[in-house]
C-alpha cells in the first residue's frame, strides 16, 4: 500500500505488518486492516502486509497433553513466525532501491499473534537470538507498534541492549493475549504489554 502521488525523489518509510489469528489462522489481506494501512499510506508510508506460517493450525491435540507440551508448541509457533518476519524484513531491505524506501525507517507492527511476532522479533534481535542472524548485521527496526502483544520466555523480559522505540496498545481485560502474564513457573509462557512496559522502564532506569 502506498500513494502513487508521493514524490519519487524522497525515500519512503516502511511499515511491515503481521496479522493476528492465534498462530492458527488469520489473513494478511483481512479487510479489517485496510483502514490502518490506508491511514499510514496517506501519511507517507509504504505498507507491506506480510504472511507467516501458522504452525498451530494443524496441531495434533494428542501432542499437547500437558502444559509443557502446549508451551513448547506455542514457542515453536512464535519462533516460526519471527523467522518468517525476519525474512520478510530482509526481502523489503533487498527491494529498497526498486521501491525507493529508507531502510533506516522500517517499522514493525502487528495485531494479537502478529503483535507477539513483532515484539518477539525486536526482543530476540536485542538479545542476540540465533534467528536474528537472518537480518543484516547492525540492523534494527525504527520502531515497533504492538496491538495486544507479548514476548515469550521463562523469566520476565530482560533486554541485553536498548530496543527501538516501542508503542504498546493493549486492553487490561484481554482474555486472549495476557495484559500482565500467562507464564508457569520454570516453564515459561507469555509476558504481556504491562510486563514489557515495566521491563522497558527498568532498562531506562538502569
Question: PLM features: residue spans?
Answer:
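Short beta-strand-to-loop junctions in surface cap/lid or active-site-entrance loops
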Residues: 1-11
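Short beta-strand element of the alpha/beta-hydrolase
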Residues: 10-22
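Hydrophobic beta-strand anchors of alpha/beta hydrolase catalytic cores
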Residues: 15-17, 47, 166
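Serine-hydrolase catalytic-loop signature spanning alpha/beta hydrolases and amidase-signature enzymes
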Residues: 22-27, 47, 91
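Short amphipathic alpha-helix adjacent to the substrate-entry channel of hydrolases
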Residues: 28-50, 57-59
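Alpha/beta-hydrolase active-site loop
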Residues: 65-98, 120
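Primarily recognizes the serine-hydrolase "nucleophile elbow" in alpha/beta-hydrolase
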Residues: 87-162
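The feature captures the conserved acid-bearing segment of alpha/beta-hydrolase catalytic domains
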Residues: 132-204
Amino acid at each position: 500500500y502506498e500513494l502513487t502521488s508521493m514524490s519519487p525523489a524522497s525515500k519512503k518509510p516502511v511499515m511491515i505488518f503481521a496479522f493476528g489469528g492465534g498462530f492458527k489462522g488469520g489473513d494478511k489481506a483481512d479487510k479489517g486492516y485496510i483502514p490502518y494501512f490506508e491511514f499510514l499510506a496517506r501519511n507517507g508510508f509504504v505498507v507491506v502486509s506480510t504472511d507467516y506460517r501458522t504452525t498451530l493450525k494443524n496441531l495434533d491435540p494428542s501432542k499437547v497433553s500437558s502444559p509443557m507440551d502446549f508451551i513448547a508448541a506455542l514457542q515453536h509457533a512464535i519462533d516460526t513466525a519471527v523467522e518468517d518476519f525476519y525474512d520478510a524484513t530482509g526481502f523489503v531491505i533487498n527491494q529498497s532501491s526498486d521501491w525507493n524506501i529508507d531502510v533506516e525507517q522500517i517499522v514493525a507492527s502487528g495485531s494479537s499473534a502478529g503483535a507477539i511476532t513483532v515484539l518477539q522479533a525486536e526482543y530476540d534481535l536485542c538479545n542476540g537470538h540465533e534467528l536474528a542472524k537472518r537480518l543484516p548485521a547492525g540492523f534494527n527496526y525504527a520502531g515497533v507498534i504492538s496491538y495486544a502483544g507479548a514476548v515469550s520466555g521463562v523469566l520476565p523480559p530482560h533486554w541485553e541492549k536498548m530496543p527501538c522505540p516501542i508503542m504498546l496498545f493493549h486492553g487490561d481485560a484481554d482474555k486472549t493475549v495476557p495484559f500482565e502474564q500467562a507464564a508457569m513457573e520454570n516453564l515459561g509462557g507469555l509476558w504481556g504489554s504491562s510486563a514489557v512496559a515495566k521491563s522497558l522502564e527498568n532498562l531506562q532506569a538502569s
